[in-house]
């Protein structure tokens, strides 16, 4: 007889869906829905915007507190990895944005294409890249360094690339660079300076601070989408334009993922480093991009940040699925590597 109590029945569709959907992605989608139904307006919008600015500063303070000087210097030893990530972020993406110029007049408005170009020059993200790399069992220390280097470099490179590629729409000035440095670089340096005292606290409260990290991003997303609702950005875009924008964003993400994966494999990087390169080289930072857009575009930033907001949602959903698949394959890869080592030892 068959013991049905021990039989492993296949998951139902709701069960499969529950395992497939990352809780953070679900929270992001819920945040977008909340902003669509109950957008912050008036005094509430001002308060939420100020809270988002504080949250972004706190994020960079934590980045500075977490990254030790020794880790930063050791990270420089993996210069090939960081070079590939930097080339993807600040060379490949802008080229993809320029390649879409021929399609833009037929698919997008001028402001949406400006936003697509801006998306392509925004630096990589720290929090999401590290979380995805950790899930996929990649090189987490390298991901921390790569994301941090990209964010710091982007404070200078992003405004320069935006001014070069976009032109007169960008308000590029010394005051703008100072504003970006004040909101992003200053908290990071403060975190570095106070790391001696803050690092032990951070080490003891990793789970709570991880929730704070993600909560900060959710607050930034809510603020951005609320602004889009109150300013009528969504009403200015036809469904056809929105679908076209999603299609172009998906194409850019797909090409970035494919190119970074292919390049990392061809250059002979280890599996752990390939994971880091793919996620750090294909992700874009909403926490860094939003304040930069506010400085570089002023009151006209509304439609410009829409491609970045959509890309951010898309990258998290797609990369969460990829990270989950790679996580399940990691034991197989480790086993195969162990077998190769044993064979080499026997032959030796």
Question: Can you describe what each PLM-predicted range is?
Answer:
Residues 29-30, 277, 291-293:
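Kinked, hydrophobic transmembrane alpha-helices enriched for aromatic residues
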Residues 26, 88-96, 121-126, 142-163, ...:
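Membrane-embedded alpha-helical segments of transport systems
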Residues 286-338, 343-348:
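C-terminal transmembrane helix pair
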Residues 2-104, 163, 167-271, 338-348:
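Structural signature of multi-pass alpha-helical membrane transport proteins
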Residues 69-70, 76-81, 105-109, 133-142, ...:
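Juxtamembrane helix-boundary/capping and inter-helix hinge elements in multi-pass membrane proteins
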Residues 226, 251, 264, 278, ...:
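Generic hydrophobic alpha-helical scaffold/packing signal
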Residues 79-87, 107-121, 138-148, 176, ...:
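The feature identifies polytopic integral membrane transport proteins across all domains of life
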Residues 101-156, 162-176:
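Membrane-interface helix-loop-helix junctions at boundaries between adjacent transmembrane segments
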